[in-house]
Amino acid sequence: MPVTGRGPCGTCAPALRSTSKDTILTHSDQPRPLQSRANGPLTGKVRVPGDKSISHRALILGALAVGETRISGLLEGEDVLNTAKSMQALGASVERTGDFAWKVQGVGVAGFAQPKAALDFGNSGTGCRLVMGAVAGCPISAVFDGDASLRSRPMRRILDPLEKMGARVVSGGEGGRLPLTLQGARDPLPITYKTPVASAQIKSAVLLAGLAAPGTTTVIESEASRDHTELMLKHFGADITSTKEGQHGRRITLVGQPELHGANVVVPADPSSAAFPVVAALIAEGSDVVLSDVMTNPLRTGLFTTLREMGASIEESEVRGDAGEPMAQLRVRASKLRGVEVPPERAPSMIDEYLVLAVAASFAEGTTIMRGLQELRVKESDRLEATAEMLRVNGVKVEVSGDDLVVQGRGHVPGGGTVATHMDHRIAMSALVMGCASDQPVTVDDTAFIATSFPDFIPMMRSLGAEFS
């Protein structure tokens, strides 16, 4: 079926279907408070939704390819659905053919059509920034917009390299904030660009714009960020290479103006979503949980590395791969955790997981220091301060020192607090995980935004034994 219906921002969206008897979450303007309380061990086997990063990229590259792309395991959360709608608005055919199964008929590199209305990305910074890159290489203009949270987030770091490639920001808010109009380049220029921070979004936007440029586009990173765009570009037929640059960095080189070919993509389970049941199982005494097909790309598994350093029992089996992305079954058992120091160079591989890591650190014995978290300040909320606030209201001793987070673990969490989510899905899920093992229940002021990335989170956690009411 084509993408139809009313979405969170007045745009089109498909109806989401749940495999659970519980109602799946969809975002609304009405707050949805929820309380989480300890209810014994968590047990069972589940598959968390498809990886959000892969889902966005599969839709975008499918739209830029010639021929048909079939995607299975797509994350059907609001963020990804907004990317699907944008591809449809730009001229690609996008259809849902079954549960988590989608078909994209592409228009080719630089083949996007002029959209008739603004591209509304809701809460999705990833979708918005990647599509900016794809549009920058096309001779069209497009209005980019989103919800109040996305409108507050800076876009200048993305726009600077795109303007060097010939795109123009015709109008926009201070700091390149949404809503803005982007005029793509009629004759895009290849560039060599050194990213100011380790950011897969900056890198990906430049590479997607570079597809339409003649010659070679190069991105240099001093710290390697997640490499899903590079792997998927290769899967679709692009000539792209990645080599080591310095101690921790990468140099990525893309030959422009390829003909990408439609491909089949199997989306692995999202490690950023798996992080929540993983930590819940570690802190709820007696738990034994299995998660299937979780992506184990080493540039995404910083959380699992850190948890193992803390003493976590996380076992991998049934290792396999698809489109260059490795995946495995994870068995997680409740563990006694200890405090550790997390180095700043690990941040790019787990930037979305620090919130739930802070929950794990609260239940550990000893001090956990997480260094170099400046990127958390420009997410859906100021996640660094919001994480500290979440812990404090539940009786955890925590300190923000510059861009570092210091958590004093005492082996248990008093709980009893109400957590303000600041319209941030990961704060909501992290707080609910905390309540699975805290002494007193934890209340979350609004769970509606969980729908952006993990619409089936609440029924899935309940199926493992969590008590949310």
UniProtKB/Swiss-Prot annotation:
Active-site residues (renumbered): D352 (proton acceptor)
Pathway(s) served: Metabolic intermediate biosynthesis; chorismate biosynthesis; chorismate from D-erythrose 4-phosphate and phosphoenolpyruvate: step 6/7
Gene Ontology cellular component terms for the protein in this record: cytoplasm
GO molecular function, a single term: 3-phosphoshikimate 1-carboxyvinyltransferase activity
EC number: 2.5.1.19
Domain of life: Bacteria
Chief place where the protein resides: cytoplasm
Keyword tags: Amino-acid biosynthesis, Aromatic amino acid biosynthesis, Cytoplasm, Transferase
Signal sequence range: none
Name of a matching Pfam family: EPSP_synthase
UniProt-annotated binding residues for 3-phosphoshikimate: K52, S53, R57, S199, Q201, D352, K379
Record keyword Transit peptide present: no
Single biological process term from Gene Ontology: amino acid biosynthetic process
Positions of region (Disordered): 21-45
Binding positions for phosphoenolpyruvate per the UniProt entry: K52, G125, R153, Q201, R383, R426
Chain segments annotated as transmembrane: none
Cell compartments where the protein resides: Cytoplasm
Function: Catalyzes the transfer of the enolpyruvyl moiety of phosphoenolpyruvate (PEP) to the 5-hydroxyl of shikimate-3-phosphate (S3P) to produce enolpyruvyl shikimate-3-phosphate and inorganic phosphate.
Family: Belongs to the EPSP synthase family.
Subunit details: Monomer.
PANTHER family per UniProt: AROM/DEHYDROQUINATE SYNTHASE, PENTAFUNCTIONAL AROM POLYPEPTIDE
Protein name, entry field: 3-phosphoshikimate 1-carboxyvinyltransferase
Organism listed in the record: Bradyrhizobium diazoefficiens (strain JCM 10833 / BCRC 13528 / IAM 13628 / NBRC 14792 / USDA 110)
